[in-house]
Amino acid sequence: MPTINENFLKLEKNYLFINIAKKVNAFMAENPDAPLIRMGIGDVTLPIAPVCVEAMKKGADEMGVKETFRGYEDSGSGYDFLKKAIAGYYEKFGVSLELDEIRVNDGAKSDCGNIVDIFGDDNIVLITDPAYPVYVDSNKMNGRTVIYADSDESNGFAAMPNPEVHADLIYLCSPNNPTGSAYTRDQLKEWIAYAKANKAIIIFDAAYEAFITDPDVPHSIYEVEGAKECAIEMCSLSKTAGFRSEEHTSKLQSH
């Protein structure tokens, strides 16, 4: 008789954003005229940018012509023309990437959860708290021990490593979801040194790097020496295309 994975019983009853949606709906039912800034799930706020629409149309047209049609690519890691474009994007930050160091997958969220499948279930996982739910849930489902580094006002919402605490896998998100804090170059140097001392791997979620404006805040952990030896970076190139409008951002800043 099949048995269940009892680790799933360690998860919350509902996905975090389902609970947030229920609370929002209840609040709006009681306060229909109240202004509300939604800070739950990251839904789009504007129509897709015209340049993206035209690019997708062009791509669809190419698939209808024998000379430009593309099927599966051979490597399983993404078309070379796309990986070259990604490498060019990283060059803006002074980061040099070989094509075999780049993998195109179905999204940063999926990768942050699925990447741990290649690691043993006995690894200790360090996650900054608060954190994006997928970091915690994906590891709890596999029965791993999850420990936390608190991000709060006392440290500027930028949790730093405790040399007395051991971890095998480390999740960092910069700029952070949900706090918005971002690690400086010196802070990332400290995390890299900690990872090397523990022979640990950093899983670095850089999905929101496009919103960084401070020159002292790296867009990629690979801007910091030694990162390639201990870090796997997940990035997204979709966050600026209608995901956050200037009007929306200014409203948040005013609060």
Q: Language-model segments: what does each one mean?
A:
Residues 206:
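Walker B catalytic acidic pair
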Residues 202-203:
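Residue-level marker for buried hydrophobic side chains located in beta-strands
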Residues 223-251:
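Active-site PLP attachment segment
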Residues 8-12, 179, 237-239:
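Glycine-rich "substrate-gating" loop/helix at the edge of Rossmann-like oxidoreductase active sites
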Residues 3-6, 10-106, 114:
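N-terminal small-domain helix-loop-helix segment of the aminotransferase-like
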Residues 67-195, 209-228, 232:
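Conserved core of the PLP fold type I
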Residues 45-49, 178-181, 211, 241-243:
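Short catalytic/ligand-binding loop motif for oxyanion handling, primarily in non-cytosolic enzymes
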